[in-house]
A protein has these predicted regions:
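Short coil-to-helix segment of the ABC ATPase nucleotide-binding domain corresponding to the Q-loop/switch region
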Residues: 99-107
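Helix-to-loop junction immediately C-terminal to a conserved catalytic motif
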Residues: 62
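The feature captures the beta-strand-to-loop junction immediately N-terminal to the Walker
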Residues: 47-49
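Catalytic Walker B motif of ABC-type/P-loop ATPase nucleotide-binding domains
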Residues: 164-167
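Hydrophobic anchor residue at the start of the ABC signature
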Residues: 153
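Conserved ABC ATPase "signature" region
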Residues: 106, 110, 117-135, 187
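Conserved ABC transporter NBD signature motif
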Residues: 70-82
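Conserved signature/switch motifs of ABC ATPase nucleotide-binding domains
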Residues: 138-141, 159
Length: 256
């Protein structure tokens, strides 16, 4: 895959990245020579079979793990651990149970130089963005799974990152809530100038949300594949081109 040398805010470049673990004393390679350029403001979905290294790649991008070889660049600078320009959203939002919605979102913003009033003002903006302005005073125990995940998204956006990294954020939700949240994410990503990298096992979700899909191989020596999703937004799951992309992915995974 070609790699552009010029970068803008939120651009990610991965060069010759490999990562392995030791399983019972034997090296197990999960990522092999990954090369990729993610454009500023792009939405990239990462899919693959279990064990293909999806979450591992996201954790390396987040700075939560080191690669064995290769490098990750954000805006042309090498990633060395976690950074304020990257925010991570996990499947479980991990809200602080003793804080209400507004305080969960504003938590930590004051340490970034904002006054308490500024921090709460910014938090209110993002709580409204995810549609929870009527629940600012609610506590996590009072929220549904979808509402809690919205709080997690608002909290991540409140730090105003250049890059949003999402590890199966909707995986624990029921089918109807998941569809609603996918629509919300598509709207938020349209309104916010942020690069998004999403790990998902849901192929339809990847097509609905992403500009491009990176398919990681499970087999040793396999090559990653990139698929362009050139569809208008908002996307119609019943549209012929959407269905064609779904069939293409199902065929690639041997599910059709």
């Amino acid at each position: 895959m070609s790699i552009a040398e010029d970068t803008r805010r939120g651009e990610v470049t991965i060069r010759h990245l490999s990562k392995s673990y030791r399983l019972n004393g034997t090296p197990l390679q999960v990522l092999r020579d990954i090369n990729l350029h993610v454009r500023s403001g792009e939405s990239l979905a990462i899919v693959g079979a279990s064990g293909s290294g999806k979450t591992t790649l996201l954790r390396v991008l987040a700075g939560l793990e080191d690669s064995d070889t290769g490098e990750v660049l954000v805006d042309g600078k090498a990633v060395r651990g976690v950074g304020a320009e990257r925010a991570v959203i996990f499947q479980e939002p991990r809200l602080l149970p003793w804080l209400d919605v507004l305080d969960n979102v504003s938590f930590g913003l004051e340490t970034s130089g904002l006054s308490r009033e500024q921090a709460r003002g910014r938090a209110r903006h993002y709580v409204k963005l995810v549609g929870l302005q009527q629940f600012e005073a609610a506590y996590p125990r009072q929220l549904s799974g979808g509402m809690a995940q919205r709080v997690g998204i608002a909290r991540a956006l409140a730090v105003q990152p250049e890059i949003l990294l999402l590890d199966e954020p909707l995986g624990a939700l029921d089918a109807m809530t998941k569809i609603g949240m996918q629509q919300e994410l598509a709207r938020i990503w349209r309104d916010e100038d942020v690069t998004t990298i999403l790990v998902t096992h849901d192929l339809e979700e990847a097509i609905y949300l992403a500009d491009r899909i990176l398919i990681l191989p499970r087999e040793k020596g396999g090559e990653p594949r990139l698929i362009e999703i050139d569809l208008p937004r908002p996307r119609d799951r019943s549209a012929p081109e959407f269905v064609r992309h779904r069939e293409e992915l199902l065929n690639l995974f041997g599910l059709h």
